[in-house]
UniProtKB/Swiss-Prot annotation:
The keyword Nuclease applies. Keywords: Endonuclease, Hydrolase, Intron homing, Mitochondrion, Nuclease. Mitochondrial DNA endonuclease involved in intron homing. GO terms for cellular component: mitochondrion. This is Intron-encoded endonuclease ai4. The gene is ai4. Pfam families: LAGLIDADG_2.
Length: 159
């Protein structure tokens, strides 16, 4: 479990993670999903990262910084956080970004990692997600799986 990694490395409290159930509806199906939460520490040494990507508590993209820092490990973490396997490819939730930012991120994924991606409009007006196509899954898995916690392999469609 991710908690064990964080706890072993001194990134969180010793309090046992709280388990709760979330019911999600898709079409006519309602499924229960187990979720866990735990408290991580705040490290002042990481404050510069926060200041780089947040202004007045609002996330901002510094596109050149993203280009510089997005590597295989960062992509793995992005997918563990905001990615979801669709049965064929992976959808990355980018609905907090403008269309211009989403277009930049899509092109970055294509150029830097040689992934085939599309931009999809989601159910929220003027919001988009990035879809990594089925054709890119084998390559994507090969470059990010080494950086993923095994409990997150389901985000790649791996059981």
């Amino acid at each position: 479990m991710i908690y064990e990694f964080f706890n072993k490395n001194g990134y969180c409290t010793n309090n046992i993670p709280r388990k709760y159930i979330v019911k999600l509806k898709h079409n006519d199906d309602v499924k229960d999903f187990e979720r866990y939460e735990f408290v991580t520490y705040t490290f002042r040494s990481f404050k510069y990262i926060y200041e780089m990507f947040y202004k007045k508590q609002k996330k901002v993209l510094h596109l050149e910084k993203i280009k510089e820092y997005l590597d295989e490990r960062a992509l793995a973490h992005w997918i563990m956080d905001d990615g979801g396997y669709t049965g064929a490819g992976i959808r990355i939730a980018t609905n907090a970004f403008t269309l211009k930012e989403v277009m930049f991120l899509k092109e970055l994924l294509e150029d830097k990692f040689k992934l085939k991606c599309t931009i999809q409009e989601i159910y929220i007006k003027d919001k988009w997600s990035i879809y990594i196509t089925k054709d890119s899954m084998t390559h994507l898995i090969s470059i990010i799986k080494p950086y993923m916690h095994p409990s997150m392999y389901y985000k790649l469609g791996i059981k």
